[in-house]
A protein has these predicted regions:
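Internal low-complexity, small-residue/proline-rich segments
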Residues: 31-312
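Polar low-complexity intrinsically disordered regions
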Residues: 1-2, 300
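N-terminal single-pass transmembrane signal-anchor helix
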Residues: 2-37
Length: 312
């Protein structure tokens, strides 16, 4: 009895068919996985939104933007991490944040979008994908968002605690927390904050915004300097590090003028195709297109500008 095996040609044809099937199936599998990651990211924001509302119900004000994610820990079942901050440890010249030493390394999955494949750290400090919104734009008009830096004053405007009654544009129309791509300590266009070489005055908002939006694809090749720690550590909320604004729509660069950090453009973004999620003060989450009208996006960042816009 003769035995019939595969010929070389048959084997090659079989391998080609298998390769073709894999090429057809792989994008579908990847799309399904991204859909699941996107849903988890949205759920993370919903959980944060519920915690914000619980905090407001107990304290009568929204949390301080400078410590939002830390202050929400007890409302997320993470009291054990919250208690690791030790205010009795005095700062030192070499380590002014020593009281936070045990808090910063904690990697909190709820604070990281699973679609972001860059490591959020964890050895010395961990990052967050979810910055709080301090307003519609530059601070020339003060902190007009849901959050800010309590007691901080800039150009005569002081950031004070925000009550629900202060949100006159409606809690369903005002941004609370967005998404962004946290830094990976390397100069990447949408992960870093870029220092524009020119100084921009308070009357040059449009010029500043245009210069940031048209940043080259490879900024370091053109001599641009950057700060690459956006989102680190998760428990802090300084402007551009833990808080963002609505100067530019999602997936645009972030910039500051030379020597004028508080007037920076700190932009939302994500690795979801086409845009980013946005948590509103009332707790609902909606996906925002990166092609959203710039004016609509900016109005969503303000709690009281009187514009008649609603969440897309």
């Amino acid at each position: 009895m003769s035995r019939r095996g595969f010929t070389v040609i048959e084997l090659l044809v079989s391998l080609a068919i298998i390769g073709l099937l894999l090429a057809l199936l792989l994008p579908a599998v990847q799309a399904v996985r991204e859909t699941a990651r996107r849903a988890q990211c949205q759920n993370n924001l919903k959980q944060i939104g519920l915690a914000i509302l619980e905090y407001e119900s107990e304290h009568g004000v929204l949390p301080n933007g400078s410590g939002l994610r830390y202050d929400l820990l007890p409302y997320l079942g993470l009291t054990s991490i919250h208690s690791q901050y030790d205010p009795l440890i005095p700062p030192t010249p070499n380590n002014p944040e020593v009281a936070w030493a045990r808090v910063k390394p904690n990697l909190i999955p709820l604070y990281v979008c699973p679609s972001d494949h860059v490591s959020p750290g964890g050895q010395w400090e961990a990052a967050t994908s979810y910055p709080s919104c301090f307003g519609s734009g530059l601070l020339v008009n003060g902190f007009d968002g849901a959050f800010g830096l309590w007691g901080y004053t800039y150009l005569g405007h002081t950031s004070n605690p925000v009550r629900m009654s202060d949100i006159t544009d409606g809690t369903s129309n005002v941004a609370a927390v967005g998404e962004w791509l946290y830094g990976d300590f390397r100069p990447k266009r949408l992960r870093a904050r870029w220092i524009l070489p020119s100084m921009y005055g308070t009357t040059e908002v449009e010029a500043f915004r245009d210069a940031c939006e048209t940043l080259p694809a490879d900024p370091p090749a053109y001599g641009y300097q950057s700060i690459n720690r956006r989102g680190f550590p998760w428990c802090f909320g300084s402007l551009g590090m833990g808080q963002y604004n609505h100067m530019l729509p999602p997936n645009r660069p972030s910039c500051s003028g030379a020597g004028v950090v508080p007037t920076g453009i700190y932009t939302a973004g994500s690795q979801h195709p086409g845009g980013a999620h946005l948590l509103f003060v009332d707790g609902h989450v909606a996906f925002q297109s990166e092609n959203i009208d710039r004016r609509v996006w900016q109005h969503l960042g303000s709690r009281n500008d009187g514009a008649a816009v609603s969440s897309p």
